[in-house]
């Protein structure tokens, strides 16, 4: 009985070791299949390989920069330019080199042979660098669109220099301020004096036909206007004396 038990245990152990040995290659090959599926998301739609210097069109398709540059260059140099000018290879929508959006990442420390061949091909055909992002092309306009105060500063730097510099507030600016204050006081005073002169000389429709208590109200309004006009005149005289 004991001998049969040891024989069965040894056979079962050998069977288990063989099963584990058979299953080990499957465990090692599973991540490679996942990596292949992940790399498929970044394949160029022209060469069907992993995108080198990837760029994305506004219609949402991924390409290698050398591939899409050659595609656009061949279209522009072809005879039938009017029929196929700047069309996306996938959806045939209009695209331009300036509208391409580059993608950046960590990159690969040891590029593969396909990447090396693409680089050599790009150098041989004198393919330029892929276009920079729109934020780097026009930094002043993009920053001004995000910050309106920066746009105002670029449009009127002299105003900001006078505003923030300690010596910017000169006598000319003080006289301009005094003139502005005087005119702000003069305009309502002139208007009130004109109304008073017009009502006293020509009268109004309400004064001739209205009831006595309305005439009393008009007299009170005239008195208050006279007092306000005297106050404004005093303020104007003080401004002239001070400035």
Curated annotation (Swiss-Prot):
The domain comment in this protein's record states: The RING-type zinc finger domain is required for E3 ligase activity.
Pathway field of the UniProt record reads:
Protein modification; protein ubiquitination
Predominant location: endoplasmic reticulum
Q: Which GO terms describe its molecular function?
A: ubiquitin protein ligase activity; ubiquitin-protein transferase activity; zinc ion binding
PANTHER family documented for this protein: E3 UBIQUITIN-PROTEIN LIGASE RNF5-RELATED
Query: Which parts of this protein are zinc fingers (RING-type)?
Result: 44-92
Q: Which GO terms describe its biological process?
A: cellular response to hypoxia; protein ubiquitination; ubiquitin-dependent protein catabolic process
Q: Which reaction does it catalyse?
A: S-ubiquitinyl-[E2 ubiquitin-conjugating enzyme]-L-cysteine + [acceptor protein]-L-lysine = [E2 ubiquitin-conjugating enzyme]-L-cysteine + N(6)-ubiquitinyl-[acceptor protein]-L-lysine
The tissues where this chain's protein is expressed are given as: Ubiquitous. Highly expressed in roots.
Location of region: Disordered: 110-135
Could you identify this protein by its name?
Answer: E3 ubiquitin-protein ligase RMA3
Could you list the residue ranges that cross the membrane?
223-243
Which purpose does this protein serve, as stated in its record? E3 ubiquitin-protein ligase.
Q: Which SMART domains match?
A: RING
As recorded in Swiss-Prot or TrEMBL, the protein's gene is named RMA3
Q: What is the effect of changing residue 59 to S?
A: Strong reduction of ubiquitin ligase activity
Disruption of the gene: reported phenotype: No visible phenotype and no effect on drought stress response, probably due to the redundancy with RMA1 and RMA2.
- Enzyme type, top EC level: transferase
Q: What is the membrane topology here?
A: Single-pass type IV membrane protein
């Amino acid at each position: 009985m004991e001998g049969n038990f040891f024989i069965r245990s040894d056979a079962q152990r050998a069977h288990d070791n063989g099963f584990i040995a058979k299953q080990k290659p499957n465990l090692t090959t599973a991540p490679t299949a996942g990596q292949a599926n992940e790399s498929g998301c970044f394949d160029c739609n022209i060469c069907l390989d992993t995108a080198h210097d990837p760029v994305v069109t506004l219609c949402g398709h991924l390409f290698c920069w050398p591939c899409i540059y050659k595609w656009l260059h061949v279209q522009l140099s072809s005879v039938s330019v009017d029929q196929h000018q700047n069309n996306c290879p996938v959806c045939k929508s209009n695209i331009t080199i300036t509208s391409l959006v580059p993608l950046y990442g960590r990159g690969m420390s040891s590029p593969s042979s396909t990447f090396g061949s693409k680089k050599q091909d790009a150098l041989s055909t004198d393919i330029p660098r892929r276009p920079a992002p729109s934020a780097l092309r026009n930094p002043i306009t993009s920053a001004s669109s995000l910050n309106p105060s920066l746009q105002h500063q670029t449009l009127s730097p002299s105003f900001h220099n006078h505003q923030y510099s300690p010596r910017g507030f000169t006598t000319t600016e003080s006289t301009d301020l005094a003139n502005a204050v005087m005119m702000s006081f003069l305009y309502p005073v002139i208007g009130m004096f004109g109304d008073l002169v017009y009502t006293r000389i020509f009268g109004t429709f309400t004064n001739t036909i209205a009831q006595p208590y309305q005439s009393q109200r008009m007299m009170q309004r005239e008195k208050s206007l006279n007092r306000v006009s005297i106050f404004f005149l005093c303020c104007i005289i003080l401004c002239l004396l001070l400035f």
